[in-house]
């Protein structure tokens, strides 16, 4: 995930944007940090999904085919 100081800076810029507004440089920094955050979030979510197996009440593996293929590609 994103470093704590970067998350703090995102929040700081968001507060400033609501109150006083951002300079062009700050707006650019905010956009860059948000892109980094979204990229880190997506990677974490993808990594988590690659560990998921779906089991129905009968005990059968019903993991979607697309996910199984993605897991296979990732781990082999």
Swiss-Prot record:
Q: Where is this region: Disordered?
A: 57-76
Q: Which organism is it from?
A: Geobacillus kaustophilus (strain HTA426)
The family line of this record is: Belongs to the UPF0291 family.
* Keyword Cytoplasm set for record: yes
**Which stretches are tagged as biased composition: Basic and acidic residues?**
63-76
Q: Where is the major localization of this protein?
A: cytoplasm
Q: GO CC terms on record?
A: cytoplasm
In terms of domain of life, where is this protein from?
Answer: Bacteria
Subcellular localization, as worded in the UniProt entry:
Cytoplasm
Q: Give the UniProt keywords, A-Z.
A: Cytoplasm
Q: What is this protein called?
A: UPF0291 protein GK1331
Pfam families, per the entry: DUF896
